[in-house]
Amino acid sequence: MGVGRARLYFQYFKAKFLKRRVTPPVDYEEIVSEFWRADFSSTEHARWHAEAGDGYETARGAHGLTLHLRRKFLYAWSANPVFRYKDCVLTARIRFLPGTHPPGEARALPNSEQPEVPASLDSTSRPACLPEAVAVDPSAMGEAVPERAGTCAAGLLFRYLNESTFYALLVSDGGWLRLDAVVNNTPLPLLGWTDTGASDEVRVLSLIAVGTSFTLCVDDQWIAQIEDDTIQAAGKVCFAAQNWGVHAHRSFELSAFSLESQPFMVETACLRANEPARIPASAHLRLAESLYAMGRAACARAEMKKLKAKCTFGLREYLLAGDIACAQHLYDEAEEAFNAALVQDPHCMRALLALGGALYQQNAYEKLAHLLATHRVVAERDAFLSNLCGHLALAQNRHEDAAAAYQRAFRLDPHQGLFALHAAQELSLLGEKEQAIQAYLHAARLFLAQESYADLERVVLALRRLDPERTEVRSIAGKLYYATGRHRQAHTQFDALCRAGSADATVWYLYGLLLREAQGTHEHDAPAAAACEQRARDAFQRACALAPDCALYHFKYAESLFLSEKDCDEPLARALALDPDNGWLHNLCAQKALREQNFDAAAQSLQRARALLPHELVVLENYIELQRQRGALACCVPLFEVETQRADAAVIAQRGQAFHLLANAFYADGCYEHAAPWYDKALREEPQNVQMLVHKAENSIKLHLLHEADALLVKALDIQLTAHVYTLIALVAAQLGDFPRAELTLQEACTLWPQCTEVRIELIHLYLTMQDRQQAATQWNILVQKEDSDRVRALHALIFEEKPPAPQE
């Protein structure tokens, strides 16, 4: 008994004084102060994980973390899931591994032929984030990649909050660097592509982030110090890479990575890196050029001041300083810089042109006159200087000399509409009306081709003042109005031109488009819609006759014939002969084959169309319809499974519309239960889409979910009033036995759309269901005044129980 009690006391005091130490769980969302160097040979100390996704793969080995990109135009990253950092020093050694091509693929284009990188991030193609890698369309970053930048880029994402908010620091295989803040998938360039001078296949990329300051270094060389306060929260760190349009496969190796987040060490590193004595003059020059190209002239001017304190300016530096001063409207400073450049090289045309522009902007006409007189021979051979001669003569009220100078400038550069505009204005002042009109027309054609609609507006106003009834003036005005969305004014101009028998194919084509648009406004007036349809066809046919070698006109003519259920073989064949690689033409061929139940021909055309237009949902819709008619609709479902990353490119780009498309296909096939979840997915993407709400309601009616359908229709009605929604609400009310509500709904619809015969027919059917033949007869008497058709006569027989009257002659 004593021993047992002693044992109990011993266990009690042991548990009380010798408590077991429990290791608390690690919070990987914690903001930590540490120095950490990655050991990629160890799972615990590497932190990054191996993974695979859509078009990319990460693999960890003894030499580092390798990110493989398996297709062109891909931007992917792999997030380090351990801890968050705000102020830190990141150092990464990145190796660019050679690009490869799969068998049978064409070799890479030279840099001069590289396509531009798209300009915006594609948020729809990114799967979920941490710790997995993320793949997107390589849009990096807001502007075209310079030809010398290379074929790909790799780097770090830091302060990574989620897949749409982070900073991105990338260096290309050509040795160019850039920094962006990405917020809500929108890239905000902080430093555009800047040449670092690095040329090896291995880059040591360093970043020092302290508050709103970011110091960037490549291979221990200072590149820039950037200030930005867009993202001030701590975030993860990611290894990222982009593959552009040259190599099909690219791989990038993060062979070494270290991170320092201890405040004292970070501050020390920042001060050391930004010591003026450690920064070479060439770095200030390259940074100033990049900042000026980005439109940040004030920052560029600050860098030029630092550069001037370190070295003597040459021609390149003076020209850049002058350009930066002009951008800030510091024309005195610009004049000084360009004069210095001319001292360096008296024959430098760029300096001469820039100096002339700076003098003109200052209204320094005496200096400008001296400059042009000194370089008279050169001025007479250069379009810009001739234009300045015109400005000088105009300032001195020498209008004849000004007109001659502007005309000479336009002869030297016939693609510059402003020179023609200046000449026209002077000729008009001199009373040379016809010459002025011709000069204005030259300017108008150039502005229209360049889509310079503000300048074109000025020209059109002048032309309409000089000769408003001239055919060319009406044509230019109509095209301007059409391009700027003023379709009613454009219709007025084109209607007058076409009635006068215009010989301009573009006028007839645009007139046809406007008539097609007007056809849609006659939804409840069938005769007017048919008349517009016929006139549009005639307009497209006339455009084809005037421009027989334009595939677009033949395509539109064929399309109008197809929509009218007429033979379109001849114009379609002609369009294909002129433009065999036009995906829309192959899509129309597929639609025609589908109508004719020629499934093999439709499949062949759609295969070609989908290859040419991979992101167009309309083409995918026709493919789905083909499979539906073949009885293979279920085979199309994998194309819409975005969660498994096997979705079609068109689905990824437009999820809501794509899900809606598949739901409609199931509905058309009578598979209402299969359609319902796809309608739900579509509405989750676009909850305010009226068409989706209505189609979902129609599907619910088929499933006898009448209360659900009623709620959907009421929501659609709150967004947009349409006769079809009123009709469906009445149908649901009638099926629920609420005939008074159905009657009131249809009566209100008849009041709102008195020309819509469909609503009145539904009201007559409702009265027949309610056995109220008197009200049905009253509505039929109104209907027969608006429509004379077989269905109206059939209603007469139902109402009056007699043989319907014979059709009128």
From Swiss-Prot:
Gene3D superfamilies per the UniProt record, alphabetical: Exo-inulinase, domain 1, Tetratricopeptide repeat domain
Residue ranges of TPR repeats: 315-348, 383-416, 418-450, 471-504, 513-550, 552-582, 583-616, 656-689, 723-756
Region span, Disordered: 103-125
Keywords: Repeat, TPR repeat
InterPro entries recorded: TPR-like_helical_dom_sf, TPR_rpt
Coiled coil feature spans: none
The organism's place on the tree of life at top rank: Bacteria
Short name of one Pfam family: TPR_16
Keyword Repeat: yes
PANTHER family tied to this protein: CELL DIVISION CYCLE 16,23,27, CELL DIVISION CYCLE PROTEIN 27 HOMOLOG
Record-given protein name: TPR repeat-containing protein TP_0920
Lineage: Bacteria, Pseudomonadati, Spirochaetota, Spirochaetia, Spirochaetales
